[in-house]
Amino acid sequence: MCASPSTAPGFFNPRPQSGAELSAFDIGLSRSMGLGVPPHSAWHEPPASLGGHLHAASAGPGTTTGSVATGGGGTTPSSVASQQSAVIKQDLSCPSLNQAGSGHHPGIKEDLSSSLPSANGGSAGGHHSGSGSGSGSGVNPGHGSDMLPLIKGHGQDMLTSIKGQPTGCGSTTPSSQANSSHSQSSNSGSQIDSKQNIECVVCGDKSSGKHYGQFTCEGCKSFFKRSVRRNLTYSCRGSRNCPIDQHHRNQCQYCRLKKCLKMGMRREAVQRGRVPPTQPGLAGMHGQYQIANGDPMGIAGFNGHSYLSSYISLLLRAEPYPTSRYGQCMQPNNIMGIDNICELAARLLFSAVEWAKNIPFFPELQVTDQVALLRLVWSELFVLNASQCSMPLHVAPLLAAAGLHASPMAADRVVAFMDHIRIFQEQVEKLKALHVDSAEYSCLKAIVLFTTDACGLSDVTHIESLQEKSQCALEEYCRTQYPNQPTRFGKLLLRLPSLRTVSSQVIEQLFFVRLVGKTPIETLIRDMLLSGNSFSWPYLPSM
């Protein structure tokens, strides 16, 4: 056990009361007063009882203690005086140990002199730099803890200053701080340089980071997010191959969004936020489509989602004539004749083509894409229209319309035709069993029309986005209009793949051979698209 500083021999305690503290101002001298050098006789060896704390005092002159060398000078009164001044100065100003001492109580000169020789004999005039060589390199950190118990009785302020002395009142030395800051600045600089060297994959501007799966600038990031969140659809005034770079990226929004998707920016990475209540309708983006006042059938309760409801409204208004007008061609409770069946079939096909020409976004596609889409899906649209108007499908009139009664044929061919008629009837009846309303039929036809399975499409990405828009509209409509049928949307979508089981050749043979003979339906579809309103069939009276 070490001797307590207050009871050690030769130690003068000016305040023997318990818990008393002594600060630099309690000494009673002016701060600017000089420190006198004591006579040589004042310096003596420390008592043996304190040897555990003052082991450095036994070192002879010129001894190097710790990592700091004395330069061979030993312990001198002048060096100790400098250390005394540094210790007392610590109480007033912690960060510096370089200044000269000021003021010392003459009554404790001998007591401090018995403890201070344990410090290194060199000058205390500098910070410990960690070099371990040269005079004046600072107080040895290894002996600051040895001096700590002896100075404790003189006040808590001096204790704090002595604790901070070995490291210069900090956790690191100036040299280590400099090295650390230099390494950090170099690392951060290399990171900044690496970011600055990455270009936006869309326009080539400086990238601000990875957004939605790719490195892009802030402009392209905001443009892509805005386009996806609002389901915006653009049109190109050129050949849909506009240059997208830093100087031309704002000239064509269609080609810019197309390049964003082409370079790998993901739609699903954009978080769906709230659509602003003042969002412009579809009529603002496509002036040729005007929404009349009032909601069509099935849209009245769809007010919470104005954008999707407007889209469905446009799909419904694109019908060339109301569904109720189909009833004029049918005779209730009676089997339709051959002429009535052919007339109704012609109207259904013509209605599908005219509807496609008037719905949003389809006329903006290239003519080659329009023809390719309708050639592929015309039979599916025909089945949907047949189900929507509750077209009667009796076997005998269908066989008669196909001309199978007029010419003898093999039994296996008749059986095959009967199977195709049965498949056609099943698809129509399954759709009718779901009680699909007009808005749902319009969305289903849009989903069928905007397919990417057609060959030779020039803009697959844009067509796919239109199909996704139609699916979103149908899903939201089913959720709001049929809240008690959570599986309705899924059931409707599952009916679409089955529509392709109905052979287009069979439909053509059953309904159109009497009208066009051997002319392919695909040729008629192209003529209807290119002729505008001048196209007419013999079974298309004015409605």
Swiss-Prot record:
A zinc finger (NR C4-type) spans 200-220, 236-260. The keyword Repressor does not apply. The keyword Transcription regulation applies. Residues 38-191 are annotated as: Disordered. GO terms for biological process: cardioblast cell fate determination; cell differentiation; epithelial cell proliferation involved in Malpighian tubule morphogenesis; fat body development; glial cell development; heart development; nervous system development; neuroblast development. Gene3D superfamilies: Erythroid Transcription Factor GATA-1, subunit A, Retinoid X Receptor. Residues 56-68, 171-191 have a biased composition (Low complexity). It is found in: Nucleus. Its main location: nucleus. Residues 307-532 form the NR LBD domain. It holds the Pfam family Hormone_recep. Keywords: DNA-binding, Metal-binding, Nucleus, Receptor, Sensory transduction, Transcription, Transcription regulation, Vision, Zinc, Zinc-finger. Residues 122-141 have a biased composition (Gly residues). It comes from the Eukaryota. SMART domains: HOLI, ZnF_C4. Residues 197-272 bind DNA. Expressed in several embryonic tissues; dorsal vessel, oenocyte and fat body. CNS expression is dynamic and confined to temporally restricted subsections of the NB lineage; expressed in many NB and GMCs, but only a small number of neurons. One of its GO terms (molecular function) is zinc ion binding. Residues 83-101, 158-170 have a biased composition (Polar residues). Belongs to the nuclear hormone receptor family. NR2 subfamily. Receptor that is required in photoreceptors R1, R3, R4 and R6 during eye development; generation of the ganglion mother cell-2 (GMC-2) fate in the nb7-3 lineage, coinciding with the transition in the expression of HB to KR in the neuroblasts (NBs). This is Steroid receptor seven-up, isoforms B/C. It comes from Drosophila melanogaster. The gene is svp.
